């Protein structure tokens, strides 16, 4: 069984991005209308997105925010491009809180922890933990996040300044809600939301990156 958090193996990752960094302008998508569900999302130039494909549930499109959390975004993008998220799962699900996943399917993979980009750790991060925000999961150690992330299915302000939000859902909150409803039927312990039967954990088929940022190196 996967542990709640992947093994911490090294010092925090320092990222030097060659892309221009811009903050996110917008708000999380709260409701998919029936008319919009089947239409492709219009990706904007200058922004970077992640498409989380969840088997039997659908796709969650997330706009990433390198201007607010550059280290978290670049780490997430790198891991996605390496295929680390293929066949990972959402293993912890709580209604009125979040869905958590992203531990590598291969337990032998060792990942480098990154700096926690949040106020309590000395970083300015303007992303609040409202419904639709994606954020890095971690242990009680500030600089311990690796691959695991969570998506808020409700506003959760007590996390503000304590965890590194790095993007928000722009399409697919209906998928997040469906995963939440399903997960609450299979959690072994309502208190922590863990789904201990791995065969019942929703599977992340893959996470693909749509990077429309303009390189500053011309």
Language-model features: where?
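Cyclophilin-like peptidyl-prolyl cis-trans isomerases
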Residues: 22-218
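Sec-dependent N-terminal signal peptides of Gram-positive bacterial secreted proteins and lipoproteins
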Residues: 3-26
